[in-house]
Amino acid sequence: MKTVEIFISGRVQKVGFRACVKRIATELNVTGTVRNLPGGRVHVYATGELMILEKFVSMVYGCPRVLIRDLRQSEIPLKKFDDFSIIKREGVSVQGFKFTAVS
């Protein structure tokens, strides 16, 4: 298991990108979070097997209405998540539960 931190820029906000990322993560059994950042970027934590994470990143490029101009990823210390959540604002997921990343 590995965790990657991903920063994505381009036309990635207000186009359904976070929902698309969550759908792909759920299909691939990847856990983590996705959230919008100030300045129009998106931040993702993704945890899974290396081959699956590579597929996850490649599938993200196929989200409709999205134009990815830059995607930077780096491996970070393992973070464990129960599922994959869209973070609406700092510390609160779509379901309204506070997320806690365990490292």
What residue ranges belong to the model's regions?
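Intrinsically disordered, low-complexity, mixed-charge
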Residues: 1-103
